[in-house]
Amino acid sequence: FSDQQIAQLLEISPNIVFVDSSPDERRFDSVVLNFRLGVEQALDYLLYKGHRKIGFLGPAYKLDQKKRPALEARRQYFIDYMKNAGLYDEHLIIDTGLSAKDGSAQIRKWLEQKDHIPTALLAYNEESAITAVSNLREVGLRIPEDVSVISFNDTPLSILTELPLTSLT
């Protein structure tokens, strides 16, 4: 929301609750996804399934409400969890940037380093997961036999893929 839009909303009511993010967390309440819990649940599940070489797919930064670079929380929660588990490997973090085109190029570049292929990937959204699945299959890897993929944002996009995605909401 722009400052002008927020001012217009405040003219209607001083009681504003934002959904999915907040333009100013000190002034406004918000309802947001618990990304930390989602990352923990996904990684707990993958570890339970026997995976130890788990990668993360997503941007290092995203744009905040005012279009400023902000750390991507899911990525940081992933790094923290994997470090605490003694399984963190910086080579398994793929910085995809913010577009599918950038992501696809980064995934292809990363796949050329054959010794850094994980047995599982946690993608920060479905677009990244779909891009990863496509690129993994292009180099002959099977999903989920060779690489399991879990994504965030369980949207209708996940059912439009040839292989159904495992997604967190």
Question: Where are the predicted features?
Answer:
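Bacterial carbohydrate/catabolite-sensing allosteric modules
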Residues: 3-169
